[in-house]
Amino acid sequence: MLLIPAIDLKDGQCVRLKQGDMDQATVFSEDPAAMARHWVEQGARRLHLVDLNGAFVGKPRNEEAIKAIIAEVGDEIPVQLGGGIRDLNTIERWLDDGLSYVIIGTAAVKNPGFLKDACSAFGGHIIVGLDARDGKVATDGWSKLTGHEVADLARKYEDYGVEAIIYTDIGRDGMLQGINIDATVKLAQSMSIPVIASGGLSNLADIDNLCAVEGEGVEGVICGRAIYSGDLNFAAAQALADKLRDGQ
């Protein structure tokens, strides 16, 4: 089980939002590159970056912080980025700068042709982020709820050739209420590409529950508020996941 620390970037700072609300941001660090180094030292094997400003305006906004993170740890572990990625030039630029994966969210829903082109041009580097409330996909920084079912879109994107799906339960994100295991497993069982869980991770019991369904196609989990608030010790969580994987 891949535990992936999230570094959410707003105005060049590392923050956490509550349920995607830009007005409810808690600043955890003014040095995102140092935060990236911290998580690598704690045993992280991949990092998940979100350009929050970029997600809302539809173009990259925290370039300086993102490039600093890539320079700090990008040659040691894969780094993935979502937020404000709406065209092929942006993808190419970020991959050239050293990102391993780009995450397409809103643009995948609104412009499937773009996603298809991205998978053709940059196969192996494209992840789709699907954010949902009650099984329905949301877009535009969670501000708009669509009529699309998560599973329907995910299967379509699998056909396009995406590398993985990050599934976020909006209702649980930043609330420390536990991962929506049932919905995540149901999605993973409906496709052959990996699903990465997101939204609500709160304690070691969640890690236990996730590891129990790893064989169903749930490859990893995004670790957000819990590892910043102290509710979850990241190093201990990764150690537990490794122990469970090895059957000890």
Swiss-Prot record:
Record GO terms (molecular function): 1-(5-phosphoribosyl)-5-[(5-phosphoribosylamino)methylideneamino]imidazole-4-carboxamide isomerase activity
One GO term describing the cellular component: cytoplasm
Pathway(s) per entry: Amino-acid biosynthesis; L-histidine biosynthesis; L-histidine from 5-phospho-alpha-D-ribose 1-diphosphate: step 4/9
SUPFAM superfamilies for the chain: Ribulose-phoshate binding barrel
Principal EC category: isomerase
Pfam families named in the record: His_biosynth
Domain of life: Bacteria
Keyword annotations from UniProtKB, A to Z: Amino-acid biosynthesis, Cytoplasm, Histidine biosynthesis, Isomerase
Catalytic reactions on record: 1-(5-phospho-beta-D-ribosyl)-5-[(5-phospho-beta-D-ribosylamino)methylideneamino]imidazole-4-carboxamide = 5-[(5-phospho-1-deoxy-D-ribulos-1-ylimino)methylamino]-1-(5-phospho-beta-D-ribosyl)imidazole-4-carboxamide
Name of the protein this chain belongs to: 1-(5-phosphoribosyl)-5-[(5-phosphoribosylamino)methylideneamino] imidazole-4-carboxamide isomerase
E.C. numbers: 5.3.1.16
An example Gene Ontology biological process: L-histidine biosynthetic process
Taxonomic lineage from the root: Bacteria, Pseudomonadati, Pseudomonadota, Betaproteobacteria, Burkholderiales
Homology family: Belongs to the HisA/HisF family.
Active-site residues (renumbered): 8 (proton acceptor), 131 (proton donor)
Subcellular location: Cytoplasm
